[in-house]
UniProtKB/Swiss-Prot annotation:
<protein>
    <recommendedName>
        <fullName>Uncharacterized protein AF_2119</fullName>
    </recommendedName>
</protein>
<dbReference type="InterPro" id="IPR008964">
    <property type="entry name" value="Invasin/intimin_cell_adhesion"/>
</dbReference>
<feature type="signal peptide">
    <location>
        <begin position="1"/>
        <end position="22"/>
    </location>
</feature>
<keyword id="KW-0732">Signal</keyword>
Amino acid sequence: MKSVKIIIILALALLIQISHIADAKTYTVNFSSIGGLEVTPDSPHPKAWHRDTRDLPSNPYYTSDRTPFTQADIDLIESPDSSGFSSGGQDTHHFYFSIPQNANVVVRWRGHAQEDGDYVTLYYWDGSSWQKLEETTSGSWTWISGSFTASCEAHILAVGHDGSLEYTHPTSDYVEIEVSVANPLPVSVVKAEGNPRNYDGFFDTDTITLYAKVVSNGNPVPDYPVKFYAEFDSQRIFLGGAWTNSSGIAKLSFIPKNVGLSDKLRVNFVAKIEDVMTNCNAYTTTTNRAILAENVAITPGSYDITLVGRMYYSGGADWVRVNWYVDENSVLKPYPIPVVQKFTGNRASVTIWKYGLDDYCTDPNCHREGIYGNFDDADWDGACIAVGSTTPMCGRDVGGACYGDPDGPLKGRHDCTYFSGYRVGPFVQMNIPDHALGFLAAMVIQLFGGGELDDFMRATHYDQHEGPYGVLVSNAGCGALNPSTEQALTHGALGLFADPKGGLGVVGFVGLIADNEHAIGIMMGHRYGIHPFTAIVTTVPNYPSDEAGWRNYMDTWLYYLLNNAVYIAKTTGEELAAWSLRYPTQSDVVNLNRAFNDFITDFLPYMHEVLWLVVNCGKTVNHPFIISTFVQFKDNFEIVHRIMLNSTLNNALGNLISEVLLQLPNVVGPPDASTGINYLLNHRQYLSYSEREIFGYRMLQLLDQLTEVVVTLLKEIPLMEQSSRDNPGWDFNWIAGCGEG
């Protein structure tokens, strides 16, 4: 019986020993990284120094009289690649590692002395003096390995000697230690105070600061490496790393744009840790990941977006490529809430390339234009028009594309400082009014006094496109003007002067944006209202570079359009469903309402001007608008026809319809107005009475104008059937003003 007890006790002891062995964890440390962070001279550990005196190792291990290794030195000992580190006149290399108490340390060192016959000795510090560990007796590249026991700190010294026992220069190529720990302490990373709130928002040019805390059994752990990441859409960006302070707090500050993070509505900031030896302990992670902030929006501090689409106008339909550029000096935050931006004209521009008609007419005889235009007649070289200080193709005042410099005298004939726009969540709009053909258009037409349509058309001659070419207006006693200079009439006088804001008309874009790679919307523009156009545009990963490509681009473009629409529908639904979290306080949502008011009223003056032209200028303006609308219907039919005949496009359309229906409840919001558009509208009651009154008055003005426009166009449509010189109809050449019915 006694022997049985002994056997049981021995078995239990063996099991305990086996469990200890099973719990043992091996830590390997070199000078490459620790805890996932690159080792630098500023890291708490490991450390490395060199010294050029020859009395070591007799001195103790203190480092005050030694020189820290530089980052280049450390890089040379990250891996055994024979690149080596030679310290010049220095004779000793001192390496320090953090280890647990009473740890057995295995050392592996690789290097050599200078010549054959020289040798290198490794020493370790036993707590009171340097003790010889191992040495090599060859000057060639070699490994030295050994082991010793130490507590908390492992100090290793490499000293070179020549054959006459004089000191020589050792070259260290690689050094590492290995420690096996039976019972490492548990360690976790948790969220600390001071992080951005969930659903907060920043520009990508802002400075963001993150905080994480490392604890073990509830106690803070100093000198622990922490890595910080941004996670979004199953992707991860490394933001940087930091070591914990005496309170166990790691702090990292960064600028999103500098680390490749921009234009994301759903970003999680995360801290991660790995198993590390520090503070006389070895740690193994129980919680190695902590979310510091969820669903933070990173909004661009500048925009550079290229949109491609179909331009519909009174001459047919062509391809158009548009580049909107807004410098960071022109992107402002009008209210202290996330994802709301105001665009100004300090540094902004638009450039338009039209790939289509390069002549006045779409038929050989110059007799028919209008709805009979051949919209596949592409001129792939394109015609470029530009307004702004930064344009990707036209440059500065090249080929008629001009710009305004708000910091100096005006150069050229356009002033981009009238650029305006807003972004509110996924909604975006941008406007570039060219005031000579925008606000001044009404004045010019009033002063001109109407006249025959073909006379007016000849007075507003077009050369190639809507760009800044040709005579703007000729009047009695003035004669023809230089076609290279845009002109405008002075108010109430017959004289002419060069207008720095002339040439393009009004161009606007309104749409939805998930990020710079996913935007979709409608671009609208006109020149005196005579040559109106609209374009359905979207971002594309690539576009054609030759004529054949543009002629066969329709199906590819539709694929991008539909898939972008699916992604944007999903993003918009997710964003509006979270608006009560993005804008949690009454002050936040009231400011959001103000931003929406600004979003709409920003482009109302330009819309007012266009609608005035349609109503007051008769067939000079409203006939082109009618034709432009019918051309768009015609091309939309072509789009629908292509989608129905193409299974890939048909599936994409089905996905879009499904996603829109799925996200519609999120966009609208529930009856209790806790999210979505209902959440926004429910808080309009907290706007001041004057704010609501002014906005309501402007909306009623717009409704009144729209009603008047509809009535005017309904009256004019029957007249389009009566084509004559005095009353051109559907087939009039609205671009050249040929005057032939």
